[in-house]
Amino acid sequence: MTYTYKYPRPAVTADCVVITRETEPKVLLIQRGCMPFKGDWAFPGGFMNMDETTEQCAIRELEEETGLRLSNVHQIGAYSKVDRDPRGRTITVAYLTIIDKPIAVTGQDDAAKAEWWSLSDLPHLAFDHYDIMQDAIRVYAQAVEEYEKIQHDRFKEQKERMHELSKQIREQCAHVQDLCSNFTKKQ
């Protein structure tokens, strides 16, 4: 027996925000090749298949629309404004991935183009992608801050190890000098 719900089911999509870790960060956008918002820019993304998770959907759509194959994405939020998609009730789950520098991409599938854009010079974005961008930048800033803290802590840890090693070497050298001095006195 098939169970049916008396409630309507919204569509579920996933979007993937890819930002570079550079002095002047860039974000990957696709130019939509079909309605709605044909010609506007958006994050790579699309509708979730029934046999995949939203994370798998984001990774698949990123590759389908840009040719970029990444597997390390982090969820930044779910977006469910009632009127966010003119096609009907749609909820999207957005993911973020940070890469070192832009990688060659091409618009594929229903994306007319795929390009890297400076965060300081964004084009008009489709749907509610400004909201997603705002959250992605917040998460990106936290990730960069955490990365810098980890690097600082690693450097501090390495510095402490080097100091300890240097101390041990000085002690060993002093010991060797004592041995040499004692040996010379005995002769």
Place the predicted regions along the sequence by residue.
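Long, low-complexity or tandemly repetitive, helically biased scaffold regions used
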Residues: 183-185
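Unchanged
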Residues: 48-147
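Short linear regulatory motifs and low-complexity interaction segments
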Residues: 154-176, 180
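Acidic/polar alpha-helix N-cap and adjacent early helical turns
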Residues: 142-159
